[in-house]
């Protein structure tokens, strides 16, 4: 039976998850067991271990393996302007509406959070769009973009702002030449855009902080949390959504992944902005 399989996966993975919690403080117990089994299984094969018990012994006696396992579990696949339709809507409808309302209210602060930002492509994409919009409107605004992730290595890469061609292939040529400089086969984001994004380590299941500590108080105008909820069971999805809800200012925007939606406890607190895209407004 499926439930028996799930229970067995939880049983055999628990010692490994407990060890990760003990050594690094990351709680993966709310992640989907099947996903964890697949990703940990990749390291089991790579280390030639015959089962999860043997792999745990390897993990406990090979310090470098811990980082390799975390890399596999928190795998970060992203690129600039990933999901072109979503970013077209952000550029053409969402950001202009937010900025125009800010200008009308004489509110010169714009606060954005990119949760699970990986190597920074998503928040940097937003920084580029905001720069272009403010330049077009001839408007000045204090822009605060916060990118968070649980992967230290990914955040270190984000801080370097140096990307291979595969990461920037979705960027229009005009924006690429304007906001990046070529370095060999890679592209480096210019300092004026890079400085707009603040990166920090943050676990969405952190029980101590409802919002990223670096952001101080949340109250975001715009939050992106794409393709993160799909990794969690419903109990942990509710925990994450509670944070997202609390972090958003009234009438602000939340963007989820294509296969994601507000959890049952929070559906009535959000209205869909676009029928064909997972863009929601807090009500």
Task: Describe the residue ranges of each PLM region.
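Conserved SAM-binding loop of SAM-dependent methyltransferases across substrates and taxa
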Residues: 119-138
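Conserved beta-strand signature within the Rossmann-like core of class I S-adenosyl-L-methionine
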Residues: 250-258
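A short glycine-rich, Lys/Arg-flanked "PGG" loop and its adjoining helix->strand segment in the class I
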Residues: 238-250
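Conserved class I S-adenosyl-L-methionine
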Residues: 107-120, 125, 144-146
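Core SAM-dependent methyltransferase catalytic element
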Residues: 222, 264-283
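Extended basic-aromatic, gly/pro-enriched interface segments that bind polyanionic ligands
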Residues: 115, 136-224, 228-232, 236, ...
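Conserved AdoMet
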Residues: 2-113, 257
